Amino acid sequence: MITQKDYEKLCHEIWHHNKLYYIEHQPIISDEEFDALLKKLEEIERSHPEWITEFSPSQRVNESLTSGFKTVAHRTPMLSLANTYSKEEIEDFIKRLQKLVGKRQVEFSVELKMDGIAITAIYEQGIFKRGITRGNGKRGDDITTNMRMIENLPLQLSGENLPDFLEIRGEVFMPRQVFLQLNEQKLQDGEVLWANPRNAAAGSLKLLDPKMVAERRLAVVFYGLAEDSSASIKKQAEVPSFFRSIGLPALEHHAYCQNIEQIWKFAEEIRSLRTILPYDIDGIVIKLNDFKDQKRLGVTGKSPRWAIAYKFAAEQAKTRIIDITVQIGRTGVLTPVAELEPIFLSGSTIARASLYNQEEVQRKDIRIGDLVTIEKGGDVIPKVLNVELSQRPLHSQPWQMPLYCPSCGTQVINIIGEVAVRCPNEDSCTEQQIRKLIYFVGKQAMDIKHMGEKIVIQLFQKGFIHLPSDIFALTEGQISQLTNFKTKAIQNLMRSIEESKHVSLERFIMALEIKYIGIGTAELLAARAGTIETLMQLNEEDLIKIEGVGGKVAQAVVEHFQNPKHRQEVYRLLELGVCPQSKTVQIFTNHAFQGKIFVLTGSLEHYTRQSAASLIKERGGKVSDSVSRKTNYVVAGAEPGSKLDKARTLGIPVLNEKEFISLCH
């Protein structure tokens, strides 16, 4: 029996996955699994409408507002579509519309469902004026400047039927070939690879430097009109040709359909084209064709009644397991990995699949030599679904987890209450040390740009780094010994290491890898302690008083800092210039920046735009996007824009980077 507490827990779970998908762009479940959670939620809400609140995921469009961008209201709400995965559900949708419209024969416009980032574009008198992300459906991020960097976006339209005001819906995406080229470059630079083109497009659109956006070679395609944007267009099927007539890039591969068989035929045609299209799609969209009927049906919750998305199921394929290897994580957990005969699936070649743990291997009875079915859905790593027992080799043997760590030879242990098998040699196990360093430089912790996994491994193998603090003692001479590292790459890495020293206290706490500490708990500890030195002095009694911190966490924190090795590492990090700062503590009092308004323009040599803005805010200043008479200083780097001209016209003081750094200190 479902309780209200179960319902609330499900709401939190869905919002967690929303955040991973829309904001962090790192989903851990497939689209199909996510939609199953939503369907379960909706079933509960039908049975218990009294439990529904405005915070239910069923009542709101997935939020993805981002700090660093101005948010603006949508003139017409930007809704999301309801999803389906079966022919039967499409038939139910058609019958429902026939009943609502009051017609036996209903016309549909069917088109591709792009797997990109939904946006709105506004044109006035044919001139591109504004680009906005979906955001929460009511408000979105103003990405106008970044959208201007998209090469195939026309900044001016023309044509006989061009209205004075045009609000249109579209999708920004990264073409597959561009994605492959840029990922290859990231690989050479030792950076973390993008999981897929959608993640790449999402991250690129939110860059604060428009020049970097241009380098990502994004593209845009348009598929819809906002309500009342063009009175001359009466039906959805007319939209693509209308867009092309005024110079807009429009969706290809669309169909006019009148029944389920025509829709299904189109779906099958598109499914067969999916892997050869130059961009990613994840299904088709079925829309009621007549705009009058669309308007009459309106919306329900967060979705239009007159449209639905049919999403292609995760693709599956059969291949053979040629070996089962073991991967050691930073906490010593041993994870079995299936090494596969390479097979092309969902647009990429699959050669490995995680088997999660020994229990999973035993439950599915997965063995070396087995023919298995693998699945790859959306962004999720490939997984082994089942074994073809009829194809099993005669003398195959059940697989067993090794008794000794493959990296260091230490006997592994099973901790009571845990499925995981661990290597206890955390200080000397090479693989654990490397994984800890990779985590330390990653986004959840110190977020050191240009220092990817391959670079960490090279630095470790050459003996240049062993502890995290060694990273901040690296020299240009050491980095120059890395493979394919030339002057610019060396400078980029040295600058990134320097910039990472200014880190929030909660991320610094995360970087220390204290047991049981996630980002939420790290934020609570940072807010209470204010400095890392204070946190190191707190006892269990002090820590338990913090709301949200239990005895288990308090004990783990105290035990961590009681270890002389851990304390020594923190002190060395601080000595090397790492400066963890709490958002809740005023580090700088009576600073020259206090209450002053800054505008940043051009490229700085030692700071990104974001890190320079953080320095200003930490010292009590404010950062504005535009120059006005209220602006106190303009900080100008290389190749400044029109903001510098305006500052000079208004007589506002202009600081070069050297002067800015001097004022900071």
Swiss-Prot record:
Ligand binding (NAD(+)): D31, E32, E33, F34, D35, S80, L81, E111, R134, E171, K287, K311
PROSITE patterns the record matches: BRCT (PS50172), DNA_LIGASE_N1 (PS01055), DNA_LIGASE_N2 (PS01056)
Keyword DNA damage: yes
Catalytic activity: NAD(+) + (deoxyribonucleotide)n-3'-hydroxyl + 5'-phospho-(deoxyribonucleotide)m = (deoxyribonucleotide)n+m + AMP + beta-nicotinamide D-nucleotide
Positions of Zn(2+) binding: C405, C408, C423, C429
SS bond partners: none
SMART domains on file: BRCT, HhH1, LIGANc
Residue span(s) of domain BRCT: 588-665
GO molecular function, one term: DNA binding
Biological processes, Gene Ontology terms: DNA repair; DNA replication
InterPro entries cross-referenced by the UniProt entry: BRCT_dom, BRCT_dom_sf, DisA/LigA_HHH, DNA_ligase, DNA_ligase_AS, DNA_ligase_CS, DNAligase_adenylation, DNAligase_N
Assigned keywords, A-Z: DNA damage, DNA repair, DNA replication, Ligase, Magnesium, Manganese, Metal-binding, NAD, Zinc
Necessary cofactors: Mg(2+); Mn(2+)
Keyword NAD assigned: yes
Listed GO CC annotations: cytosol
Pfam families hit by this protein: BRCT, DNA_ligase_aden, DNA_ligase_OB, DNA_ligase_ZBD, HHH_2, Nlig-Ia
EC id: 6.5.1.2
Gene3D superfamilies attached to this UniProt entry: 5' to 3' exonuclease, C-terminal subdomain, 6.20.10.30, BRCT domain, DNA ligase/mRNA capping enzyme, Helix hairpin bin, Nucleic acid-binding proteins
Top-tier EC class: ligase
Chain coiled-coil ranges: none
Annotated catalytic residues: K113 (n6-amp-lysine intermediate)
CDD domains, per database record: BRCT_DNA_ligase_like (cd17748), LIGANc (cd00114)
UniProt function note: DNA ligase that catalyzes the formation of phosphodiester linkages between 5'-phosphoryl and 3'-hydroxyl groups in double-stranded DNA using NAD as a coenzyme and as the energy source for the reaction. It is essential for DNA replication and repair of damaged DNA.
Family (UniProt): Belongs to the NAD-dependent DNA ligase family. LigA subfamily.
HAMAP family, sorted: DNA_ligase_A
Protein name, per record: DNA ligase
Species of origin: Protochlamydia amoebophila (strain UWE25)
Lineage: Bacteria, Pseudomonadati, Chlamydiota, Chlamydiia, Parachlamydiales
